[in-house]
Swiss-Prot record:
Keywords: Cell cycle, Cell division, Chaperone, Cytoplasm, Isomerase, Rotamase. This is Trigger factor. Residues 162-243 form the PPIase FKBP-type domain. Residues 441-450 have a biased composition (Low complexity).
Length: 479
């Protein structure tokens, strides 16, 4: 087999492949064996009919068509390997010549990872805000804790902002009931803005067992984006009574004996949270600086595929009704033009970032170990409420392990970038990034649950599983 490559653009190539007919003999044998199992000829057991009779029955053209269908994927993969290409996305294959007993010639156009001129990572400078914990931050935590230990007491008066109410809801669209909008005994805090627009205004001033109907736009379900007449009935009204902020409260709400001890502990926790947030800002800034300093050619087909996928997901819940989608965007203060522009910009940035991180990972020879995969699986299993081993099986069944592998590798790459760069805060103080971005590959910056006990046993990821994920990482989530 011979193959050559034409560079159509920095991100797209055409592979020309010539396969001598002699090399197709195994594929021809396979095609005849399949036909022999499918076709029953008088006087022959299944699978035993001779080639000539099978060919006479179905025609030589049908046999060659089967041969081509079987041969193309394998020969394409061989050409990609021999030419050391890194495809992203699926190829467009065209058979340009098929001469019986002579040769098979086909072309394959495919997007590939571009060559990227990478900057010297040691020259990168990253600047972020310093970690600042104020007394107001601590008092906000105290207030939240105080509310958590408050008690609700019923009152006999019209509802006011800040009250807790139990309500019944129903809705109609064009005079017809909306079953999914009907609910009873729903608890709601007035002023929280957590439910539909206009609800709080309708409830305020109502007394127990009083109702009011108002007009609003539904944001979910079959009628999302449509105007509806919503009726709310107040069933009960309660106020929250807060405990005194004294040492007795500290003992009730924590393991500490005094409010001073509680405040000191909260200051440590807030500092830790803000330190993690700073690490996340460092990570994001590192990517931003790299994108500013590096030219990354974009594969248009890959960008368009991601744009289309995002749009599909956005309107899927609206039965792909473009008018309802436009109405929904309008209610959010946006428009289809703004959505499309943001969608494309986000897709371009995401794909540029992925290609850039992959190029740096290749240059730095970033390796993903079993521990790296195990840590990510444990983190993801917490987020999804699954056992790590159960999540691993789901990822394998859905062929999502390579995408996870690629994401972990990019995370390790960002850590390496940050560790090599100079990182300071806006006050000019250099920041020690070792904890989150050190050579150990600690992924703590990506873990929201900083400070939690990570002593639970990590899922065992076999070497074969890790190797399979690595080998499949050729057409990952840039598709």
């Amino acid at each position: 087999m011979k193959s050559t490559v034409e560079k159509l653009s920095p991100t797209r190539v055409r592979i020309n492949v010539e396969v001598p007919f002699a090399e197709l003999e195994p594929d021809i044998d396979k095609a005849f064996k399949q036909l022999a199992q499918q076709i029953r000829l008088p006087g022959f057991r299944p699978g035993k009919a001779p080639r000539k009779l099978l060919e006479a029955r179905v025609g030589r053209g049908a046999v060659l068509e089967q041969v081509v269908n079987d041969a193309l994927p394998t020969r394409y993969s061989q050409a990609v390997t021999s030419e050391s290409l890194q495809p992203i996305g699926q190829p467009e294959i065209e058979v340009t010549k098929l001469e019986d007993n002579e040769e098979l010639v086909f072309t394959a156009e495919v997007d590939v990872r571009p060559e990227i001129d990478l900057p010297d990572l040691s020259t990168l400078t990253i600047t972020v805000d310093p970690v600042s914990v104020t007394d107001e931050d601590i008092e906000a935590e105290i207030e939240a804790l105080q509310k958590r230990f408050g008690t609700l007491t019923g009152v006999e008066r019209p509802a006011e902002n800040g009250d807790f109410v139990s309500i019944d809801l129903s809705a109609t669209v064009d005079g017809k009931d909306v079953p999914e909008a009907k609910t009873e005994g729903l608890s709601h805090e007035l002023g929280s803005g957590q439910l539909i627009e206009g609800l709080d205004e309708a409830i305020i001033g109502l007394s127990e067992d009083e109702s009011k109907t108002f007009t609003t736009t539904l944001v979910a379900g079959e009628h999302a984006g449509r105007e509806a007449e919503v009726t709310v009935t107040v069933k009960s009204i309660k106020v929250r009574e807060l405990p005194e902020l004294d040492d007795e409260f500290a003992q009730l709400a924590s393991e500490f004996d005094t409010m001073d001890e509680l405040r000191a502990d909260l200051r440590e926790k807030v500092t830790r949270v803000k330190t993690v947030q700073q690490a996340e800002a460092i990570r994001d800034k590192a990517i931003e600086v790299l994108l500013e300093q590096t030219e990354v050619p974009l594969p248009e087909a890959v960008v368009q595929a991601q744009v289309d996928d995002t749009l599909h997901n956005a309107i899927h819940g609206l039965d792909h009704d473009e008018d309802r989608f436009a109405d929904s965007l309008k209610e959010q203060g946006s428009s289809r033009e703004e959505f499309d522009a943001d969608n494309r910009a986000n897709a371009e940035k995401a794909i540029k970032t992925q290609l850039l991180m992959d190029a740096i990972a290749d240059k730095l020879e970033i390796q993903v170990g079993q521990n790296d995969l195990s840590e990510r699986l444990v983190l993801m299993s917490r987020q999804y409420g699954l056992e790590p081993q159960q999540l691993l099986q789901m990822l394998q069944q859905n062929n999502q392990l390579p995408a996870m592998f690629a994401d972990v590798r990019r995370g390790l790459t960002v850590a390496a970038v940050v560790y090599a760069a100079t990182v300071t805060d806006t006050d000019g103080t250099e920041i020690d990034t070792t904890e989150f971005f050190g050579p150990s590959g600690d992924q703590a910056a990506a873990q929201q649950g900083a400070g939690e006990d990570d002593s639970e046993a990590a899922v065992e990821v076999s070497e074969d599983t890790a190797d399979d994920a690595s080998e499949d990482d050729t057409a990952d989530d840039t598709k």
